């Protein structure tokens, strides 16, 4: 067994070289096997990829496309979403403020509150708004719902493809199915507005079905459970149809309405979030819709973007075991400080679900989800857990600010309550991030349409400065 740790890399190198070294005419000839060659290439990267942190300051590099004060570098304009987390004072400095999120000029709370009061589903209405820029009237909304429902069933070839994949990662299956849709599209490369809108509606409609089928097949092939493939039903909302395809009729009306609201809250978040920006960057090249959306899925799959809610719910389960008294603030504070000092839990120094790149005093999505989580916890008999989660939020923010020296405010983000809601609805962790994609496909397609239709558009092409310098070439025989 070879030790491949970085600390023992020299030992590993000698082991491999020794095993594959032969004596020939008093001359050692090293035969590099493929495994060692991969190691050697990887080892060289340690130096070739090293860039001094001071160089970023020297050349005024906007790392992560962020300014020195933490605000995002302005790279584009949009009419779709607006993320507000701070204001600027008279000197241009950032001033923390309560967070707000706008969809096509409408504040998120103004869209969500009527749905709660009227106890109706609204994801389709919000999708219409984000795609078109206008709120639908009753007739338009009913026609749009029918259009989405008509497009939910999958081509039999796509179903066969999902069955053949039997993958353990639903996001990868989703991306591959999206790319496969290119093959079945009669006009896949057409970027006219009509065709873009048709493709967008079809993607929004098919994402729930792909995800539900992919999970059920994963559940069968990997977990050995019974295989159930349920076709979407007419006259059900997207949220209801998704739960039906996942769980048959084993869900409540409140479960479906909570999922519907979760989809609304995650549908859009401006043009600068990583996955939406990825879609806009790829769209600026005029590539096809399916390639662009698959790239967005790849971005969202990353644990720093779409996978954080799983980290929050796992941390929550750990804290439920680690803290004996869920009402003891002092006991919780001590443990959270140990986490920040990398002494407890996964020793990353993080309290998952606390902090955001833009929001300062509050994340409006987390505010809405906190309200929804409380309503659902009451129905499910999980109010003690909900109250403990609220206490973790309260003390986590306080401990993080103390740890930072009080210089920067922090708040709970979208991921803090979303995983708990998914769990109460009875949805497995394997589809937490895919559900995020099921919601965000609306924002992605809206931004793609906008990127390809505003005046003066250009391919997005930022600059990278090379700091290596020139080298003299050495002939192969002299190396």
How should these model regions be labeled?
Residues 1-15:
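Single conserved hydrophobic/aromatic residue that forms the stacking wall/gate
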